[in-house]
From Swiss-Prot:
Gene Ontology CC: extracellular region; host cell plasma membrane; membrane
Protein's name according to its UniProt entry: RTX-I toxin determinant A from serotypes 5/10
Membrane topology according to the record: Multi-pass membrane protein
Gene: apxIA
GO biological process: killing of cells of another organism
Hemolysin-type calcium-binding repeat boundaries on the chain: 730-747, 748-765, 766-783, 784-801, 812-829, 830-847
Known function: One of the virulence factors of A.pleuropneumoniae, which has a strong hemolytic activity and is cytotoxic for alveolar macrophages and neutrophils.
Localization: Secreted; Host cell membrane
Reported modifications of this chain: Palmitoylated by ApxIC. The toxin only becomes active when modified.
Any one GO MF annotation of this record: calcium ion binding
Record flagged with keyword Metal-binding: no
Length: 1023
């Protein structure tokens, strides 16, 4: 019998070879045809019906015969009764199957009995009748599955027979074993295919089911993983146990804690268990049953091993890519709805690609999984000594060949889908006369305006301008790029597109439909022209904008199935901005990219050349080089809105006011916007790949070199705000207005009447020659006045203020513990809050003290006309006491005036009051004035104050005071203070109007308007 069956096996080989050749050409369709040929040429199954057989309740003899005939099973009606026939064929009446001279005998009574005993037999053997089609009933389904099973069993018997013969020393060639192995693999594939109907039906069914299942809440991943048998064996010996999953795949399942990845793995489990059903269980049952049918013994332990390995072969990872495709399609379809209303359906096209290729992937992946499961089961049977070891190797090799054919077919199908999408794009472009991918960027920009309208509409109010010119850049879009790559149209997709939009009164102005107006903004030529605008205007680059120039793209083949779309940028050397002529304007260049690196690593820089109007302008500069012709008006240049590096401002060579050279040092810690070239990799199946180069930007260091230097030329710029780093300023011989902004800055005003601000940080400010204003701001600053009349304000922090020359000087310590050094001219001192030390000079000095100040120490060097103003204290609030050579001024604490070492000098200590200086000079303050204008002369304080004895208003001081009509000291003191302040060159008039550096309505928030005005008001009011 074995030899006759072997002859039949040999006949199958030609059929299978023909199948593999056709499959290589036509993919899944050829596979289906090949499987049909195998089935038609399979082992002959004959249904034997004894003459005394009567069908049981629930079925009929007629149904059984019809089902057999529909499946091509021969029906033999015997003249013998059931018992005689059974004993003749099977030797017993209890067997279902046996052998006859004509083929394999199926005993109808026993089969009928089996059907009625197990109503779910058809499902366990071959799937539901619905899966096979409505025309096949349960009986037909069971017969079909049994027929396929018998083919597998007999193929296994033939292979087993060959192996036994070889072990017994017979000459059995390797080709005979290979042919038998091929037959076994083909039978296994046929079994699984029959369980789901045709290959086409299966693909369609899976495509329908995949999307709904992926929408399920996938939970309980850990418990599902725990149910995979023998998963604990994963590790170094994992491959040796199963031979199916790699260590990488196993470690992915076991160790990846990322939730997203877990969801994907769970999705794979859902597909494998819910859509595929119990394929692993079915395959292992087929293999075990096949061995039993072949007369070989098995054990529960070996059966468990087979089931375990088969379960691992159908891993959730096998379906990970399938799950990704359907999920990606779903996400893209949802995403596309946003842009369809703006006339772009590219995202929906991309979704259709993932849907169609996902269905193909699902069908072919499932067939591959079945092949892997079959190979795994046979391998496990070999491990359990149920079959010889060569069987596993043969089956594995054959299934590998079939898998390769499927992969080749898949690639061709994927490319056909891509071509279909490309044709749709061509049709759209022909109809609309526009680049499809540019239309995608237009839709993205429309959505951007919709999303950011509230923000953009606020700029009119925020910047106090009538018109906003907003420039944005739609950068490279990965979906647009992917669609271009898949459709082989990478050369047609630009790196993005730039747009200009106008806002007035918070409303978007209508203009050209494509929102691109070359009259105002031309990114190809690098020109921006606002000269036609007759309103106060803000020019703002909302997003980073690429360097000016034209993109050239070329698609080339770089390998057998590899393509590259190369990018070349024909860049411009500079942007030219023509400003608003007759209205105030603001120009914000901080998002205009000036530094670029091409794909070869070569660096280039794009200069911004600005020709501004005749009014007051503000210009925010970036990290690259700029040339600014600011024109008339009070114009301010800002460097603190973005990282512009370490700056040096130099006006020492200026021939006109407002001329400066700004050098920028971009060290390793300086991150700037720079243009770079990146690559998007796109795969169309496994073998075909597209690489698309595109421009993008990033915020990172940019090392200058190769002749590239960042330098600004400023012309007619009246005020400069530095960076947030350590800057150096060198003024001109004209008026300079500098702001250090953040960082520890060094500022040198040099000649001219300068206004210098340190702002935040520990700054050093030198006024140089001229009447200068120096303001330290926050931090521990050092202010040096130099020649001329100087106005120094330390601001917050522990500051040091010095003036060495000049007829008039104002020194304000501000908050903190300060040290003030006056000149030998006329000095006005106000130490401010904190414990300060003040050094007077030989000239006429005025010291101001307020009750909220701390302990001030005054070292008066001489002079005979010094004044101390107690700005908000009366003589009733203070007392005087001599300690050594010092005169101490005490102020009341909680309404009580104390004379005690803990309280003495809680207001002021005037050092060496009672110590005579050289050549008759004294260290006294000749006049002390209170808030009401009453004053006392130093000679009376000297007479009344004995060592250790306090003197105040109530014990002798009152009679020495000068006050009341005719004796009020405040009017004259007010005049003296105003003269000192106005002599510094900053203030004049009754209310202290600023003449230098006013800045107009666009003045910097820390401009000279604020501090001198406020100081003049409170100082003169108190006087």
């Amino acid at each position: 019998m074995a030899n006759s069956q072997l002859d039949r096996v040999k006949g199958l080989i030609d059929s299978l070879n023909q199948h593999t050749k056709s499959a290589a050409k036509s993919g899944a369709g050829a596979l289906k045809n090949g499987l049909g040929q195998v089935k038609q040429a399979g082992q002959k199954l004959i249904l034997y019906i004894p003459k005394d057989y009567q069908a049981s309740t629930g079925s009929s003899l007629n149904d059984l015969v019809k089902a057999a005939e529909a499946l091509g099973i021969e029906v033999h009606r015997s003249e013998k009764n059931g018992t005689a026939l059974a004993k003749e064929l099977f030797g017993t009446t209890e067997k279902l199957l046996g052998f006859s001279e004509r083929g394999i005998a199926l005993f109808a009574p026993q089969f009928d009995k089996l059907l009625n005993k197990n109503q779910k037999l058809s499902k366990s053997l071959g799937g539901s009748s619905e899966a096979l089609g409505q025309r096949l009933n349960k009986t037909q389904t069971a017969l079909s599955a049994l027929q396929s099973f018998l083919g597998t069993a007999i193929a296994g018997m033939d292979l087993d027979s060959l192996l036994r013969r070889r072990r017994n020393g017979e000459d059995v060639s390797g080709s005979e074993l290979a042919k038998a192995g091929v037959d076994l693999a083909a039978q296994l594939v046929d079994n699984i295919a029959s369980a789901t109907g045709t290959v086409d039906a299966f693909a369609e069914q899976l495509g329908k089911l995949a999307m709904p299942y992926l929408t399920l809440a996938l939970s309980g991943l850990a418990s599902k993983l725990n149910n995979l048998p023998d998963l604990s064996l994963a590790g170094p010996g994992f491959d040796a146990v199963s031979g199916i999953l790699s260590v990488v795949s196993a470690s992915f399942i076991l160790s990846n804690k990322d939730a997203d990845a877990g969801t994907k793995a769970a999705a794979g489990i859902e597909i494998s268990t819910k859509i595929l059903g119990n394929i692993g269980k079915a395959v292992s049952q087929y293999i075990i049953a096949q061995r039993v049918a072949a007369g070989l013994s098995t054990t529960a332990a070996t059966g468990g091993l087979i089931g375990s390995v088969v379960a691992l072969a159908i891993s959730p990872l096998s379906f990970l890519n399938v799950a990704d495709k359907f999920e990606r399609a779903k996400q893209l379809e949802q995403y596309s709805e946003r842009f369809k209303k703006f006339g772009y359906e590219g995202d929906s096209l991309l979704a259709s690609f993932y849907r169609e290729t996902g269905a193909i992937e699902a069908a072919l992946t499932t067939i591959n999984s079945v092949l892997s499961a079959a190979s795994a089961g046979v391998g496990a049977a070999a491990t359990g000594s149920l079959v010889g070891a060569p069987v596993a190797a043969l089956v594995s090799a054959i299934t590998g060949i079939i898998s390769g054919i499927l992969d080749a077919s898949k690639q061709a199908i994927f490319e056909r889908v891509a071509t279909k999408l490309a044709n749709k794009i061509d049709e759209w472009e022909k109809k609309h006369g526009k680049n499809y991918f540019e239309n995608g960027y237009d839709a993205r920009h429309s959505a951007f305006l919709e999303d950011t309208f509230e923000l953009l509409s606020q700029y009119n109010k925020e910047y106090s301008v009538e018109r906003v010119v907003a420039i944005t850049q739609q950068r490279w879009d990965v979906n647009i790029g992917e669609l271009a790559g898949i459709t082989r149209k990478g050369a047609d997709a630009k790196s993005g597109k730039a747009y200009v939009d106008f806002f007035e009164e918070g409303k978007l102005l209508e203009k050209d439909p494509d929102r691109f107006d070359k009259k105002v903004f031309d990114p190809l030529e690098g020109k921006i022209d606002l000269s036609s605008i007759n309103k106060t205007t803000l020019l703002k680059f909302i997003t980073p904008v690429f360097t000016a120039g034209e993109e050239i793209r070329e698609r080339k083949q770089t390998g057998k199935y590899e393509y590259m779309t190369e990018l070349f940028v024909k860049g411009k050397e500079k942007w030219v901005v023509t400003g608003v002529e007759s209205h105030n304007a603001i120009y914000d260049y901080t998002n205009l990219i000036q530094l670029a690196i091409d794909k070869k690593g070569e660096k280039r820089q794009v200069t911004i050349e600005s020709h501004l109007g005749e009014k007051n302008d503000r210009i925010y500069l970036s990290s690259g080089s700029s040339i600014v012709y600011a024109g008339n008006g009070h114009d301010v240049a800002y460097y603190d809105k973005t990282d512009t590096g370490y700056l040096t401002f130099d006006g020492q060579s200026a021939q006109k006011a407002g001329e400066y050279i700004v050098t920028k040092e971009l060290k390793a810690d300086v991150k700037v916007l720079k243009e770079v070239v990146k690559t998007q990799d796109i795969s169309v199946g496994k073998t075909c790949s597209e690489k698309l180069e595109y421009r993008d930007y990033e915020l990172s260091p940019f090392e200058l070199g190769n002749g590239i230097r960042a330098k600004d030329e400023l012309h007619s710029v009246e005020e400069i705000i530095g960076s947030n780093r350590k800057d150096k300023f060198f003024g001109s011989r004209f008026t300079d207005i500098f702001h250090g902004a953040k960082g520890d800055d060094e500022i040198y005003g040099n000649d001219g009447h300068d206004i210098l601000y340190g702002d935040d940080g520990n700054d050093v400010i030198h006024g140089g020659d001229g009447n200068d204003h120096l303001v330290g701001g926050n931090g521990n600053d050092r202010l040096i006045g130099g020649k001329g009349n100087n106005f120094l304000n330390g601001g917050d922090g522990d500051d040091e203020l010095q003036v060495f020359e000049g007829q008039y000087n104002v020194l304000l310590g501000g908050a903190g513990n300060d040290i003030l050094y006056g000149s030998d001219g006329t000095n006005l001192f106000d130490g401010g809050v904190g414990n300060d030390k003040i050094y007077g000079g030989l000239g006429k000095d005025i010291y101001r003290y307020s009750k909220e100040y701390g302990r001030h120490i005054i070292i008066e060097k001489g002079g005979d006309d010094d004044t101390l103003l107690l700005s908000d204290l009366s003589f009733k609030d203070v007392g005087f006491i001599r300690i050594g050579d010092d005169l101490l001024v005490n102020k009341r604490i909680g309404g009580t005036l104390y004379y005690h070492e803990d309280y003495n000098g809680n207001a002021l200590t005037i050092k060496d009051w009672f110590k005579e200086g050289k050549e008759g000079q004294n260290n006294k303050i000749e006049k002390i004035v209170d808030k009401d204008g009453a004053y006392v002369l130093s000679q009376y304080l000297t007479e009344l104050t004995a060592p250790g004895r306090g003197i105040n208003y109530f014990n002798g001081l009152e009679e020495k005071l000068y006050y009341g009509e005719g004796y009020n000291a405040l009017p004259q003191l007010r005049k003296d203070i105003e003269q000192i302040i106005s002599s510094t060159g900053a203030l004049t008039g009754e209310h202290g109007q600023v003449l230098v550096g006013a800045g107009g309505p666009l003045a910097y928030s820390n401009s000279p308007n604020s501090i001198p005005n406020a100081f003049s008001n409170y100082l003169t009011q108190s006087a």
